[in-house]
From Swiss-Prot:
Organism, as annotated: Thermotoga petrophila (strain ATCC BAA-488 / DSM 13995 / JCM 10881 / RKU-1)
Domain of life: Bacteria
Location relative to the cell: Periplasm; Bacterial flagellum basal body
Alphabetized PANTHER family for the sequence: FLAGELLAR P-RING PERIPLASMIC PROTEIN FLGI (PTHR30381), FLAGELLAR P-RING PROTEIN (PTHR30381:SF0)
Listed name of the protein: Flagellar P-ring protein
One Gene Ontology biological process: bacterial-type flagellum-dependent cell motility
NCBIfam families registered for this protein in UniProt: PRK05303.1
GO MF annotation terms: structural molecule activity
Family: Belongs to the FlgI family.
Tagged with keyword Ligase: no
Pfam families xrefs: FlgI (PF02119)
Length: 331
């Protein structure tokens, strides 16, 4: 006999979610000009105990690439299994100054088996403009040795390493937030309603029209005369203003892992669906003048023994039929 589920508003959930959470502007946005920049370079890891590159893949092309990036090696240097060609990557933060240290990551380019115990030789790191902004060097840390993983995952993680504070900044990163007498606030998650709320909150805080949302991702902010010579203090006050971001009605499902994530006010229209051993009847109730929600539906399905794959398949059918008010994203 099929199981019948009635998802009504009379269902009382032991856990409730409130989406009217306020947060600081600095947690959802940043100032234009104050962003990370990506650096990259090609280097050589030495000191590997026979787990480096075989030498068969170290073609003249790779040698030329290393010379282009300022690393001088001979073909014989690359034939030993104690060395490995690596790509070196780093994110340099805004306002980084000469002499500061930043973290970097190394990843094998060729057929090395493991970078564990290796040492990265001095490697220049370039920006998108072709200039050297940092130099990396140091011991490679693999980590995760005690974590139980499949053999395939273990092999993958052993050829990617980490150098905490392994690169020294050699050139200041130019960062200019001020454009005339204004700065621009950029939302990390563009949204029309959130942009309008940020502008309104700033204007209410300073009791003057300083901010204006110019599109869903940007708010133009005029620096008042009182702070023309103290921009940092003004921006710090702006960062601490609390706003209520607008959370879109959205469901995200990962078919491979069976994960279901839903946020915002995702609601359901009335429907009846039959799926396998389940018959689901969803009815919007009258209590509190609210509709049936995804939270109610997923909780009821889990209580009835539905697997994550069952839940995902049911959500897909409901969404494609137009009974979900929100966006469904399948990963």
């Amino acid at each position: 006999m099929k199981k019948r589920l009635a998802v009504l508003l009379v269902i009382v959930l032991t856990i409730t979610f409130s989406f009217s959470v306020t947060t600081r502007i600095k947690d959802i946005a940043f100032f234009r000009g104050a962003r990370d920049n990506q650096l990259f370079g090609i280097g050589l890891v030495v000191g590997l105990n026979g787990t480096g590159d075989s030498g068969n893949v170290n073609s003249p092309l790779l040698l030329e690439m290393m010379k282009k990036f300022g690393v001088q090696v001979s073909e014989n240097d690359l034939k030993s299994k104690n060395t490995a060609l690596v790509m070196v990557l780093a994110d340099i933060p805004p306002f980084a100054k000469e002499g500061m240290r930043i973290d970097c990551v190394v990843a094998s380019i060729a057929d090395a088996k493991s970078l564990a115990g290796g040492y990265l030789l001095q490697t220049p790191l370039y920006g998108a403009d072709g200039k050297v902004y940092a130099v990396a060097q140091g011991s490679v840390i693999i980590g995760g040795e005690d974590v139980k993983l499949s053999s395939n995952l273990q092999k993958r993680y052993r050829v990617v390493g980490y150098l905490p504070e392994g690169a020294i900044v050699e050139r200041d990163i130019p960062s200019d937030m001020l454009d005339g007498d204004s700065v621009t606030i950029l939302l990390r998650q563009p949204d029309i309603t959130t942009a309008a709320r940020v502008a309104r909150a700033i204007n209410e805080k300073f009791e003057m029209d300083l901010a204006k949302a110019i599109d869903p991702s940007a708010i133009k902010l005029t620096v008042p005369n009182a702070f023309q010579d103290d921009l940092i203090t003004f921006l710090s006050l702006v960062e601490e203003i609390e706003v209520q971001p607008d959370v879109p009605a959205r469901i995200v499902v990962n078919e491979r892992t069976g994960t279901v994530l839903f946020g915002g006010d995702v609601k359901l229209s009335d429907f009846v669906i039959s799926y396998g051993n389940f018959t689901i009847s969803v009815t919007g109730g009258k209590i509190g003048d609210k509709d049936a929600t995804i939270s109610n539906l997923v909780s009821a399905l889990k209580a009835a023994g539905a697997t994550p794959q069952d839940i995902i398949a049911i959500l897909q059918v409901i969404y494609e039929s137009g009974y979900i008010t929100g966006e469904l994203i399948i990963m």
